[in-house]
Amino acid sequence: MKIALGIEYNGQNYYGWQRQEKVRSVQEELEKALSHIANEKIDIFCAGRTDSGVSGTGQVVHFETNAIRPEKAWAFGTNAHLPDDIAVAWAKQVDDEFHARFSATARRYRYILYCNKLRSAILAGGITHCHLDLDAEKMHQAGQCLLGEQDFSSFRAAQCQSHTPWRNVHHLNVSRIGKYIIVDIQANAFVHHMVRNIVGSLIEVGAGNQPIEWMQWLLEQKNRQLAAPTAKPDGLYLVDVIYPQKFDIPKRPIGPLFLEDGLLNRPLK
């Protein structure tokens, strides 16, 4: 049988999602817990491999198993064997044709900036602190040139293994809640560090160091060295993965935490 799971995790204590030798990964911890419940070795496939320090509230995985368990056992039982910073949010038996990665039509990320002169100890690791009072409206306007199917070479990490820099951005919204600025971006897929590289350059616009038109210019140059430094992994969350309705994948409120859609100033598409 094939099982899909919704996964939430705090990435601060992990060297990314993907299993690696001699370092902790989210994938390894989840596979160990699932293997305990299934009484057999479990290999999982995820919708999106997040980097070291990046968190997820809407990750989706699937695995195949010979074990027959009720859905609640895959959720509650697995959670009992996971560390506190990883949790199963839902479990569902899916059709054989479902694949967590290849069946997905889009991924959605949110990047959280905390704009305050002094940093916060409580929020450390969950947000990126910015001592400047950024202009969220200018950041939003600057980001609109990135919509649609385009070449994102200027926002692509040098070590990116993708065969093409072309991606299709469905929406990019920048909103403010008090001292928090939320960059919300959805695309069919992302090149390596794409969200963090975009946010790094949007910060330059929000700080007044570059004009709104700078983002369009960067996009046209297709040169990563001309864009701003990569934003930190702190504050980046994989919040949703979109699938065709036929798979009936469960949906949860878009996070993280208090940042549900209804609380944002700008309606999200």
From Swiss-Prot:
Substrate binds at Y109. One of its GO terms (biological process) is tRNA pseudouridine synthesis. The keyword DNA-binding does not apply. The gene is truA. It catalyses: uridine(38/39/40) in tRNA = pseudouridine(38/39/40) in tRNA. Its EC number is 5.4.99.12. It holds the Pfam family PseudoU_synth_1. Keywords: Isomerase, tRNA processing. The keyword Transcription regulation does not apply. Homodimer. One of its GO terms (molecular function) is tRNA pseudouridine(38-40) synthase activity. This is tRNA pseudouridine synthase A. The active site is at D51. Formation of pseudouridine at positions 38, 39 and 40 in the anticodon stem and loop of transfer RNAs. InterPro entries: PsdUridine_synth_cat_dom_sf, PsdUridine_synth_TruA, PsdUridine_synth_TruA_a/b_dom, PsdUridine_synth_TruA_C, TruA/RsuA/RluB/E/F_N. Belongs to the tRNA pseudouridine synthase TruA family.
